[in-house]
Amino acid sequence: AVSFVLPYFFATFALYVIPKNMTYLDTDKQTQADLSITEGIYDEYPLYSLFSGTETKNGKRMMLDWITSPLNDISAIRKRQEAIAWKELPELPLDEEELDFIEYYLEYRDQIKRPNILVSLTSAFDRLLRHDAQRYIIRRGVTLIILLLNRLDTLRKNTLENAPLLLKELAQSIQDTIHGSELKEVIGLYKDKEKSPSNYTIDKYDYLFRCIHFELIRGLLSQIYMLDVCRTAQHVAINRGFCCCPEMTDTMDLSITGFVHPFTKEGRSNDWKMPNGNICILTGSNMAGKSTTLKAITIAVWLAHCGLPVPARSMICPVFDGIYTSINLPDSLRDGRSHFMAEILRIKEVLQKAKSGKRCLIILDEMFRGTNAQDAFEASVAVNELLKKYLHCSFLISTHILEYAKHFEKDSACSFD
């Protein structure tokens, strides 16, 4: 399996970088595994690998959070989309190495003391006699943060009136953080890397940055990582021809034009629309591409809920409360569970989600393939009759059992592709 799950996180990353006021789409591990969100099966590439080319390490971590935590808040989704589509996204204020050094400096474990001129002079004399790596870390960390704050303030001033809401919020956050605190003291101070602050100034701002306003600095860094994510997503959209702004709607309209599976080489694009009724049945022989089509549609819906570009020319997508799939189900020798039993349990599980009243997209690929054709036909018909009751959900079902499809060809709740 190909995996892009990051092995560790900075201790404070989740606390300061991942937002707490979002509402998220409901899903589960089986769905993420079926869609290869972070880990590919059968040598497939993970979906995350498409968007993992961020400029910073914490940008990667934020992108991982975005792609594994789809939203069901239409305004939050649109806010991300508009920022990614904005052609004048600013560059990052510092490069990856400089931002990594700031992270290291902020987490550096030493005794921070209140600034004192006498102590600064004494420590300066000591450093003439020996090489002090500790002092280098503090001096460079302070200097880089001063440079960062000045460049962020310039970014704020250059934000256009017609900029997307996400960028306006970024500019306002910079304004409130810097100019609403003692951090404003450094604006205009040592803008050039060549100029070096005095030892007392270093001690003063080290105390300010790591003791008094540690959380404010962390908050500003999170804004930079968010900008990194938006720039990376925009780069993917441009290079691959993805649609940045799928139209998110409160209705159940779901249609997509020119969609492809993002990892299908020289794949042929398709158009698809969820017609009247809540069930769409995809028919075709084995190896005809039904599973790939189901995955391609579901990946597009998933990415749209992440606020990320989708592999299509255009798309209209409902804001779902949940996405669930039954595609690659494992059996279990340990539990004595056959593939057929795994299918039954999974379908029961997703039906419980549909019964909850939430608006869900549910994907069922080749139901009951673990048994004979007659039993699979009868069981599929029984499940289909249940699905017709849940008009608040959309069901995409693939099958090569033509008798099953013919059984519902005149049913207004079902459509075929």
Identify the function of each model-found stretch.
Residues 21-182, 216, 220-226, 259:
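Conserved amphipathic alpha-helical "coupling/scaffold" segments
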Residues 85, 228, 348-351:
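Structural signal for well-ordered, non-membrane alpha-helices
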Residues 3, 8, 12, 16-18:
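Short, positively charged and aromatic/hydrophobic N-terminal segments
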Residues 47-52, 63-66, 204-212, 284, ...:
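Short hinge/gating elements
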Residues 240-417:
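ATPase nucleotide-binding head domains, primarily ABC-like/P-loop NTPase cores
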Residues 198-242:
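Charged, surface-exposed helical/loop "interaction arms" that form contiguous linear patches used
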Residues 181-205:
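Extended, charged coiled-coil "arm/hinge" scaffolds of SMC/Rad50-like chromosome-maintenance ATPases
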Residues 155-161, 236-245:
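Long amphipathic alpha-helical segments
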